[in-house]
Swiss-Prot record:
The keyword Lipid biosynthesis does not apply. Keywords: ATP-binding, Chaperone, Nucleotide-binding, Phosphoprotein, Stress response. Residues 618-632 have a biased composition (Basic and acidic residues). Acts as a chaperone. Residues 600-615 have a biased composition (Low complexity). Induction: By stress conditions e.g. heat shock. GO terms for molecular function: ATP binding; ATP-dependent protein folding chaperone; unfolded protein binding. It holds the Pfam family HSP70. This is Chaperone protein DnaK. CDD domains: ASKHA_NBD_HSP70_DnaK-like (cd10234). The modification Phosphothreonine is found at residue 198.
Length: 632
C-alpha cells in the first residue's frame, strides 16, 4: 500500500499532511504556505485558479470566485437560503434539487463537490511534489455534525479529484488524534472546533491508544464566516449613515468589505481595536467615497455575542449525552481559526470551568489527525484504535408519519441494527421505505436521506407480512439500508445517496472534466514556461547586441535581428511548438555573439595578465631605485 495523505478540507483553508518515519508532517504548498485558501476562481479567459492565486483576485472577480463552498456540500437548494445571502457568486437550484453554482466566465453550472475537487486536487499535487510520487489515496475530514448527504458529497469530491477516499474522519476526532498521539495517560477530552463555516463539539475518552468518541454535537451553519458577516453588516450600516449610500448591492464593494472584516476580526484577537480603511469604496455625483472606521474589541464582542452563545447549548448537550459532568473533562482542546477569538475562549472557560488547552495548532491539528488515521490504515501507525460515532439518529417513516429510530445518535460506528415491520393496509404488495436522519419525532421534520421500494410481497391482511429493515453504517458514517420480506426471502438494498446528490454518471463526467482540467493546467504551465524562456532569451540577445553588435558581421547581426522578430511574432500567437522552434533558431543564431563575447573575454584576460606582469617589473625597478637613493 502506498502513502495515504491526510486532508483537512476546510471552509476557509485546507491543509495536507503525511506520516513520515512515524511522525505526522504538514506539507507546504507551492507558495510556501502550510495552509491553502479553499478558494476556486475562473478568469474571463476560462482559466481555473486555486488557492492563494484565486484569493488574490477576489475583489475584481467576485461572481466567479467561489469560497466557503463547504457550506453548500450535500445540501438541497431550499436548505441554503441564509448561506446564499453571504456570498457574491450565483447559487441556483440544480436538476436534482441540490444547490449549484452558476459560473458566468465558463457559462457552466457546477456542483459543490466538483468545486471542492479543485481544492483537493491542489492538496494532492502539493503532496505529490513533496513525496516525488503519485498519490491516489487519502483520508479526508468532515465536521462531526455533517449528515450522510454531506459525507457522501465529500467522498464524491475526492473521487472527482482522482483520490480513493479510504476514510472519512470527523474533524474533532482527527484533532484528538493529533493531541493524543504521544499521550499515555487515560483522560477525557472535549474538542471545541469552530472553523470558518461549521461548529463541532466532541467528547472523547483516551487511553491505551484507544480514542473513543462518547458524544458529538454541533451546528453546520455556524462559523467564522458568520462573525465576518456581522462586521460587514455593521460597516454597511455605518457607511449608509455617513454617506446615504447602500453598499449591500455592490458586489465589488462587498468583496472588499469581506476582506477587511476578516482582517479586522483577526487583528482584534490580539489588539483592542482595528482600523478599517477602504479608499474609493464607491462614488456618487460629488466624487469618490472612502470608508474609514475604527472597530473596538468591545464593539465586536457585542455584535457577535449571539453567535458566541450559540455554541453553548451543543456543548452542554454533548456533555449530557456522554453521561458526564463538565468537571469530569480533563482537557478542552481548541481547534479551528475562530477559536483564537478571545470571546470564544472566554465562553469555553465558562462552560468547562477550566482554561482551554492551546497546545495544538488550530489550523493544522485536523490534517495531522487525518494523516495519523492514514498511518493507522497502512499499518505505519501501530497501537492506535479510533472508535467514532454517528452524530444523528437514523430511522424510517412508519404509519402516521412518525419517525421510528433504528440507530440512536452517538452510537459507535461501524454498526448494524435491524427491526421487523409489517404492512399498513390489507393486500399491500409493496412498501416504500423512506430513510430519515434527525432527532425530531415526526418524519416530515427530519431529513429524508433517500427512499426505495420493496415489492413482490404476497397479498395478505395488514400486519401479517414480516419485513426486516436493516441499517448498516460504515466507518465513514455512510449509511447502507436493506429491506427483506421474511416470507419470500426477497431483498432490496441501497447505499443511501442524497436524493439531491450526484449520480454515478455525473461523478464520472466530473472525473473526466477534472482530468481534462489537469491536462489544460499542464498545457497552460508549459505555455507560460515556454514564453518566459523566449522572452528571457530575447532580452539577453538584445542586450548583447547593444554591447557586441559592432564586433560581428552585418550579415550575422541582421540574421539575429530577423530571428528576434520571428520569435516576437510567434509570441503574439498561442502555438507553443512554434515558439519553441523559433526560440531554438534564435538560440542558434545568437551563438555568433557568444563567440565574440568569449573571444573578448579571453583578450581582456590576456591583457590583464600582461599588465600585471609589467606592473610587477616596474615595482621591482622602483624598489631598487629607492634603496639606491637611500645609500646616497
Amino acid at each position: 500500500m502506498g502513502k495515504i495523505i491526510g486532508i483537512d478540507l476546510g471552509t476557509t483553508n485546507s491543509c495536507v499532511a503525511i506520516m513520515e518515519h512515524g511522525k505526522p508532517v504538514v506539507i507546504q504548498n507551492s507558495e510556501g504556505g502550510r495552509t491553502t485558501p479553499s478558494i476556486v476562481a475562473y478568469t474571463n479567459k476560462g482559466e481555473r485558479l486555486v488557492g492563494q492565486v484565486a484569493k488574490n483576485q477576489m475583489v475584481t472577480n467576485p461572481e466567479n470566485t467561489i469560497y466557503s463552498i463547504k457550506r453548500f456540500m450535500g445540501r438541497r437548494f431550499e436548505e441554503v437560503a441564509s448561506e446564499i445571502k453571504m456570498v457574491p457568486y450565483k447559487v441556483e437550484k440544480g436538476q436534482n434539487g441540490d444547490a449549484r453554482v452558476n459560473i458566468s466566465n465558463i457559462k457552466k453550472q457546477m456542483s459543490p463537490p466538483e468545486i471542492s475537487a479543485a481544492t483537493l486536487t491542489k492538496m494532492k499535487e502539493t503532496a505529490e511534489a513533496y513525496l516525488g510520487e503519485t498519490v491516489t489515496e487519502a483520508v479526508i475530514t468532515v465536521p462531526a455534525y455533517f449528515n450522510d448527504a454531506q459525507r457522501q458529497a465529500t467522498k464524491d469530491a475526492g473521487k472527482i479529484a482522482g483520490l480513493d477516499v479510504k476514510r472519512i474522519v470527523n474533524e474533532p476526532t482527527a484533532a484528538a488524534l493529533a493531541y493524543g498521539i504521544e499521550k499515555k495517560n487515560e483522560e477525557i477530552v472535549a474538542v471545541y472546533d469552530l472553523g470558518g463555516g461549521t461548529f463541532d463539539i466532541s467528547i472523547l475518552e483516551l487511553g491505551d491508544g484507544v480514542f473513543e468518541v462518547k458524544s458529538t454535537n454541533g451546528d453546520t451553519h455556524l462559523g467564522g464566516d458568520n462573525f465576518d458577516d456581522e462586521i460587514i453588516k455593521h460597516l454597511i450600516t455605518e457607511f449608509k449613515k455617513d454617506s446615504a449610500i447602500d453598499l449591500s448591492n455592490d458586489k465589488m464593494a462587498l468583496q472588499r468589505l469581506k476582506e477587511a472584516a476578516e482582517k479586522a476580526k483577526i487583528e482584534l484577537s490580539s489588539a483592542q481595536e482595528a482600523s478599517i480603511n477602504l479608499p474609493f469604496i464607491t462614488a456618487d455625483a460629488n466624487g469618490p467615497k472612502h470608508l474609514q472606521y475604527t472597530l473596538t474589541r468591545a464593539k465586536f464582542e457585542q455584535m457577535v455575542d449571539h453567535l458566541v452563545q450559540k455554541t453553548k447549548e451543543p456543548c452542554l448537550n454533548a456533555i449530557k449525552d456522554a453521561g458526564l459532568k463538565a468537571s469530569d473533562i480533563n482537557e478542552v482542546i481548541l481547534v479551528g481559526g475562530s477559536t483564537r477569538i478571545p470571546a470564544i475562549q472566554k465562553i469555553v472557560k465558562e462552560i468547562f470551568a477550566q482554561e482551554p488547552n492551546k497546545g495544538v495548532n488550530p489550523d493544522e491539528a485536523v490534517a495531522i489527525g487525518a494523516a495519523i488515521q492514514g498511518g493507522i490504515l497502512t499499518g505505519e501507525t501501530k497501537d492506535m484504535v479510533l472508535l467514532d460515532v454517528t452524530p444523528l439518529s437514523l430511522g424510517i417513516e412508519t404509519l402516521g408519519g412518525v419517525m421510528t429510530k433504528l440507530i440512536e445518535r452517538n452510537t459507535t460506528i461501524p454498526t448494524k441494527k435491524s427491526q421487523v415491520f409489517s404492512t399498513a393496509a390489507d393486500n399491500q404488495t409493496s412498501v416504500d421505505i423512506k430513510v430519515l436522519q434527525g432527532e425530531r419525532e415526526m418524519a416530515s421534520q427530519n431529513r429524508v436521506l433517500g427512499n426505495f421500494i420493496l415489492d413482490g410481497i404476497p397479498a395478505a391482511p395488514r400486519g401479517v407480512p414480516q419485513i426486516e429493515v436493516s441499517f448498516d453504517i460504515d466507518a465513514n458514517g455512510i449509511v447502507h439500508v436493506s429491506a427483506k420480506d421474511m416470507g419470500t426471502g426477497k431483498e432490496q438494498k441501497i447505499r443511501i445517496e442524497s436524493s439531491s446528490g450526484l449520480s454515478e454518471e455525473e461523478i464520472e463526467r466530473m472525473v473526466r472534466d477534472a482530468e481534462a482540467h489537469a491536462e489544460e493546467d499542464k498545457k497552460l504551465k508549459e505555455s507560460i514556461e515556454t514564453k518566459n524562456i523566449a522572452n528571457s532569451l530575447i532580452y539577453q540577445t538584445e542586450k548583447s547586441l547593444k554591447e557586441y553588435g559592432d564586433k560581428i558581421t552585418s550579415e550575422d547581426k541582421e540574421a539575429i535581428e530577423n530571428k528576434i522578430k520571428e520569435l516576437k511574432d510567434a509570441l503574439e500567437g498561442s502555438d507553443v511548438s512554434s515558439i519553441k522552434s523559433k526560440t531554438e533558431e534564435l538560440q542558434q543564431a545568437s551563438y555568433k555573439i557568444a563567440e565574440m563575447m568569449y573571444k573578448d573575454a579571453q583578450a581582456s584576460s590576456s591583457n590583464q595578465d600582461n599588465a600585471q606582469n609589467n606592473a610587477g617589473s616596474e615595482s621591482k625597478e622602483a624598489d631598487y631605485e629607492v634603496v639606491d637613493e637611500d645609500k646616497k
